[in-house]
Structure formats: structure tokens, C-alpha cells
Amino acid sequence: AMAQVMKYHEWPEAPTPVIPAYQTTSFEFTVPQLNATTFRWNEMQNTYEQEDDGDAVAELMRYCGQSILSDYTKLSTGAYTTDVAIALTKYFDYDKNLELKYLEYHDISEWENIIYDEIKAGRPVFHSGYSLGGGHAFVCDGYDGNGMFHFNWGWGGSHDGYYKLS
């Protein structure tokens, strides 16, 4: 979801700083430092015919994962949503006034207005949800005018569609 929002904005334009190495929590292996890079936005597509065609988006996703200290297991990748906002400003030159908002501090009407205003302004919204069993990050990128919001779940189009926020 983080990479999808970054691709939408095609930002940053300038090279990233070095992203330091860290040790994962589950298997305690060291993820090596990533050197500064400039993302190749023009090479990123929505679909790919050849495996090598995805190298540019794979690089973006690797930098996103490392910037938020992702933990990797055989079945999943995990990170904290709060780390996304930190990484966007620290490593990817996003506005320091970027806000992280939580539904639990708003009623549903306020939340719909917040999301609608972002979509109307041309800004897809990074979302996440979680339970005791795990979580998932996804993107809200549209509104139908009838109280339904479009979500991209990040599963190659599977289950993407319009849903109520409630």
C-alpha cells in the first residue's frame, strides 16, 4: 500500500538517502543497508508480461519494506502503520506535516468526510486494519458519490471494489 501511494505521486523525484541495515524480530536475520537510489517511476506498470519487467517496482517495494523495518517470515511481511508515516518523511522527502489519523478518534461521519476530502484533492489514502490474527495495509483511491469508497487491497485486483467505510 505504501508503494502504491508513492507510485501514484511518483515521489520522491530526488535520490533517497541510504536506508540503514537492521535485524528482523522473528528470525533475527540482518537486512543489509540499502544505498541511495532514484526510483524509476516511468518503468513501473500496472501489469507485467515478463518477470524482469517488475524490477523497478520490486526495488520500490524493497525500499519501502526496509524503511519501515519490516519483519519477514515464510508466510508474511509485517510492520507497524506508524512507521510508514515516519519513513515517508525521513527517507522519501514527503511533507513533514503528513498526518496519521485513526478512525477510533472520529465518528463514522467525520471519517467519511476526512477520506472524501483526501480523495477529492487527488490523494489516495493509505489504510490499515488489524485484529489479533494479523493485519493488512490497503489503499482507498476513489468515491462513487453514494457513500461508497473504492479500495485496492493489493492482491492483483482480487476483491478490489466499492465498500462502505462503516
Residue ranges and their predicted role:
Residues 146-165:
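Catalytic Cys-His active-site segments of thiol-dependent hydrolases/isopeptidases
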Residues 86, 90-152:
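Active-site-adjacent substructure of cysteine-protease-like catalytic cores
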Residues 60, 64-72:
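Flexible glycine/proline-enriched surface loops and loop-helix/loop-strand junctions
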Residues 1-7, 53-57, 72-88, 136:
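Active-site nucleophilic cysteine motif
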Residues 69-77, 102-105:
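Second-shell loop/turn segments in exported
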Residues 2-11, 69, 89-94, 120:
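Sec-exported extracytoplasmic/periplasmic mature domains
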Residues 45-48, 67:
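N-terminal leader/propeptide and maturation segments of large enzyme subunits in energy/redox metabolism
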Residues 1-42:
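Active-site nucleophile-adjacent alpha helix/oxyanion-hole segment immediately C-terminal to the catalytic cysteine
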